[in-house]
A protein has these predicted regions:
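P-loop NTPase catalytic cores that bind/hydrolyze ATP
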Residues: 3-7, 64, 86-91, 114
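Amphipathic alpha-helical "lid/sensor" segments that cap RecA-like P-loop NTPase cores
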Residues: 1-43
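Short acidic, hydrophobic short linear motifs in intrinsically disordered regions
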Residues: 63-73
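Short, cationic-aromatic polyanion-contact patches
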Residues: 24-27, 42, 46, 95-125
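Short amphipathic alpha-helical interaction segments
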Residues: 73-94
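N-terminal positioning helix adjacent to the helix-turn-helix/winged-helix DNA-binding module
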Residues: 38, 45-52
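A cross-kingdom feature that marks ATP-driven nucleic-acid transaction machinery
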Residues: 107-189
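Hydrophobic residues on short alpha-helical segments
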Residues: 53-61, 161
């Protein structure tokens, strides 16, 4: 959730938010810094075109990982240029391909949000803005808590991929998926 940002870690520690329940109580509350933090960070960065970038990031955070899936959900608009900027200019998303796919292939490419905080913010806060506007923080907390096992599993998976990459000694580290499913991480010596 913190994305490694010391300010966020300090806020959790200072407010005794050290368990999942306490963290969610702190994050999903009326005066929480986190409610508008993602928006404040990115609107300045994206400028007047922030809407399309927010829409793309929101879809990625919610499981639409391919360009085709995202374009379909967004009504068929072409987003190739926006994906390229999110990846290469803003460094917010990463392109992944199945571990055994041929290098350079675009088939089965998926996009993920590389920053844990922004991924969390888009998945739970921005996606559920209506709960916030109605000040229905209890239901928002329950929604996020119900998804904790799945969400934390994906974060842990990415952590292990990063750690294995830092160790070195592997030809590739990644996931394998076909059109709709993904399986466990594979690593090759």
């Amino acid at each position: 959730l913190t994305g490694g940002i010391p300010k966020y870690v300090e806020l959790f520690c200072d407010n005794q938010a050290l368990s999942v329940d306490r963290i969610y109580d702190f994050v999903f509350s009326e005066n929480s810094l986190f409610i508008d933090e993602g928006r404040n960070l990115l609107i300045t960065e994206f400028g007047k075109n922030y809407g399309i970038y927010f829409s793309i990031l929101l879809e990625i955070a919610n499981g639409h990982y391919t360009q085709g899936e995202i374009e379909s959900v967004l009504g068929g608009i072409s987003i190739g240029g926006h994906l390229s900027k999110l990846e290469n200019v803003y460094n917010l998303i990463t392109r992944e391909r199945p571990i055994f796919a041929k290098p350079g292939t675009k088939k089965n490419v998926r996009y993920i949000i590389g920053d844990n905080f922004l991924n969390f913010w888009f998945k739970y806060i921005e996606r559920n803005r209506s709960y916030i506007e109605l000040q229905n923080f209890e239901d928002l907390r329950q929604l996020a808590k119900a998804d904790y096992q799945t969400y934390s599993g994906k974060v842990l998976e990415n952590y292990f991929k990063q750690k294995l990459a830092e160790e070195g000694g592997f030809k590739e580290i990644g996931s394998w998926w076909e059109t709709k499913s993904s399986t466990n991480k594979e690593r090759l010596n």
